[in-house]
Amino acid sequence: MLKIYSSLSQQKEEFKPIQAGKVGIYVCGMTVYDYCHLGHARVLVCFDIITRYLRAKGYDVNYVRNITDVDDKILNRARDNGESVDALTARFIDAMHEDERALGVLSPTSEPRATGHIDEIIAMIQRLMDKGYAYHASNGDVYYSVEQFADYGKLSKQKLDEIRAGARIEVDAEKRSPADFVLWKAAKPGELSWDSPWGEGRPGWHIECSAMSTRCLGDTFDIHGGGPDLKFPHHENEIAQSEAATGCKYVNYWMHAGAVRVNKEKMSKSLGNFFTIREILDKYPAEVVRYFLASSHYRSAIDYSDVALEEARSGLERLYNSIRELYGELGAVSMDEPLVGEYRERFHQAMDDDFNTSSAVAVLFDMAKAVNVAKKEDRTRALSLAKGMVDLAEVLGLLQADPESLMQGEGEEVGGLSVAEIEDFIAQRNAARANKDFAESDRIRDLLKEKGVLLNDSREGTSWQRA
């Protein structure tokens, strides 16, 4: 039985989809004015794993992740760069997709863009106006009247009086209450804008997600996710808008990924510890980064550091090492080993417990140990266990590559040696061993070790990996 921790109830709840066998998920995507950073990577990988697991359980998943392609930040960046909004957003959408592919993130079912849903956004604002939840200010903006929504604050567990008193909200004479937020922004000269009943303008950020999610998934859908910083005000405002407009419960399960820190500090440009995905991928293999993100429970805070990434590399290499000499034979394996079923059950129990990837990864390590033991005793059993391990790891998006690509790198030099030179040294060492010249064999092993190349001897022959 799958249980999901809902941020709304603040407890684990049995997952009951609205429609049997089908799941609708909406995740707030990127505002495309810059490259994706590590926090984005966590959300991307987290909900990729959740979607993979739901599909593995047999659900037909409609996974919607939006793109915000009109926003103050986008307009300001385009102006500063001297380029069109279309050119800016197209460039960073392409970059986002490149980052996703590198991290092994599968494409969502649909990826709606705000600019493609202006009609739906205007229609939702009009419904809010008609019901008395929104008002047209004298400056041309349209605001949501927070005081009209009795349940405002139910997601973030804040009371409206506390929000008014505690929030650092700029005084705006156009607002009836400081907590009110904009639904439609009147256009400034030269800005990107659309015609509306309230004049030329563009949508506010919050209404974009309400309109797109309900358009794609219906007035009520199963799961809404995002980063921890979106719970308030963005998701709180989404609830207020959507439930006021439709009269229906908006979302059944609210899921929020944990925060990402860097060397135990909040990631920020001002602290100089802000990393884009591509900057991190310049230092570490993509699967190592994915393993790092997947090996912690999605709700827990994680701390990025070089030490943590090296530990992730070591852990992933241990898993790959266990199947390395078996990899070429896994395609023909039929899983008859009863122990595979036991591990599969443990893996599913972990994932059914609010997608506990940390415990699921621990199951993979137990399987790796069993594979290593079986390799010495029963190769058929080892192959069956290895195949089962790789199949389970696919849910996490791990262990799907040829082990050599991680262990040796993508054709890069190691310690100044090319792959061809390393292979030549291994051939020389094999010849020395055949001639029982063990001193020469040890000399070559030590030389390669100094260069950062470790040799592994097995009955299949000698393989190598980066130190």
Swiss-Prot record:
Motif 'KMSKS' region positions after renumbering to this chain: 266-270
Cofactor comment text: Binds 1 zinc ion per subunit.
UniProt entry tagged with the keyword S-adenosyl-L-methionine: no
Names of the cofactor(s): Zn(2+)
EC number annotated for this UniProt entry: 6.1.1.16
Catalytic activity from the UniProt record: tRNA(Cys) + L-cysteine + ATP = L-cysteinyl-tRNA(Cys) + AMP + diphosphate
Gene Ontology cellular component list: cytosol
Protein name: Cysteine--tRNA ligase
Biological source species: Hahella chejuensis (strain KCTC 2396)
